[in-house]
Amino acid sequence: MISIHAIDIDALLPQTQCTKCGYAGCMPYAEAIAAGDAAINRCPPGGETGIAALAALLGVAPLPLDVSCGTHQPHRIAVIDEAACIGCAKCLRPCPTDAIVGANKFMHSVIASLCTGCELCIAPCPVDCIRMEIDPQHPVMMNKDAARERFQLHTRRFERDQRERLELLAERERAVLSTDGNGHG
């Protein structure tokens, strides 16, 4: 196997961020492949074409898709049954590209052009109002670079929100500790 950087491997992955490979996203999977810790056949969205591209890059023989990770399917997108959606917002956080829009207690919708088809929104939905459909308008996977960029933005926003929450909690704790028992500073 030729020594290749993870970024070169990541460039060949479909950027669905689906985690079906067993890793937290496409880049962690690419890093595992580069380190020799993962096989090249664990990406169902990439299918045989993706496996062949990885094999060529790494100078190894292609392998059949590891079906324990799933099967290759045509690109599908999430569709929300808006009449059944209760607006719980549990599907928003798992979406790696922020393709689902909505607010708590309001119906949600999917921006089809941003959906990678990862299926990560399905399990958290308590009313099973999300289904996957082949999108005739977008039969081929969206632009990988755009999907990667949206995922990176999503991740940075989540990390920023987490950091701000922790700072707010620390500030509140300091305020409580700085007051005497009567609420005076």
Provide a role label for each language-model segment.
Residues I2-S3, C69-Q73, S113-G185:
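Flanking helices and flexible, charged tails adjoining ferredoxin-like Fe-S electron-transfer domains
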Residues M1-L63:
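Long, charged N-terminal interaction/targeting segments
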Residues H5-T16, D37-P45, L65-G87, L92-R93, ...:
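Ferredoxin-like iron-sulfur electron-transfer modules
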Residues A53, R93, A123:
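Surface-exposed charge patches
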